[in-house]
Amino acid sequence: MADESNTGSIAAAVAPNADVKAPAAKKKRSPRRQKAVAEPRRAVSETPAAKPRRYSEQQRKEKLKLIETQVTEGKVTLKDAIKSAGISEQTYYQWKRTVKPVEQKAEKRLPTGEELADLVRLEEENQRLRKLLAEKLRAENADLRKRLGLD
């Protein structure tokens, strides 16, 4: 308690530290950068989109044939052959799908007179063989029943 009444020594203790520095000014920050405005992404190539083009059936068949020959010769891959033909992969597969049914219909031909006669003869032989097989199986079943004593 004696120290509390002695205020002079405190003043003397504070006096030597009178050179206490004022708090340093805070470092100023630079203003925040604004967020970058997202620009819409463009296509990889800066060229304008290709104008839709119509190909005739003959042109389509030629391009498909060109692609097939390039691939079968082993010169390029299918993807590269399609690009070199100047069409997209989707177009290639659509064309290929539409050409196939037409070719399949063309491949089917009607049988001639000789072929019809052969077909009729084969069908008659087939019927005769089926009857023989059925008779043989019936006889075998009857024989087995007799042996087992079921009949």
UniProtKB/Swiss-Prot annotation:
Residues 11-23 have a biased composition (Low complexity). The keyword Ribosomal protein does not apply. Residues 24-35 have a biased composition (Basic residues). GO terms for molecular function: DNA binding; transposase activity. The keyword Transcription applies. Pfam families: HTH_Tnp_1. SUPFAM superfamilies: Homeodomain-like. Residues 1-61 are annotated as: Disordered. InterPro entries: Homeodomain-like_sf, Transposase_8. GO terms for biological process: DNA transposition. Keywords: Nodulation, Plasmid, Repressor, Transcription, Transcription regulation. Belongs to the SyrB family. Seems to affect the transcription of cya3. May be negatively autoregulated. This is Probable transcriptional regulator syrB2. It comes from Rhizobium meliloti (strain 1021).
